[in-house]
């Protein structure tokens, strides 16, 4: 699944266009490398999102095309 779509489906970022723009601006890294929106997300990837002064780092636990809002948080876990 594309990185921008994963971020939207997992509700880490609310809109896919915002995720796409953040990738283009270099604000999202996967496994410590700046990632493009077209990056293919895999289980085990560590995604770091830096927007403004906030930074979030998560580890991908599952990749699903469709997820209910209540279950979105099961797609990742906090990474240290």
What does each of the following model-derived ranges do?
Residues 1-43:
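A basic, amphipathic helix-loop patch mediating RNA/tRNA/ribosome contacts
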Residues 46:
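Glycine-rich, charged/polar anion/phosphate-binding loops
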Residues 53-80:
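C-terminal structural segments of small proteins and small subunits
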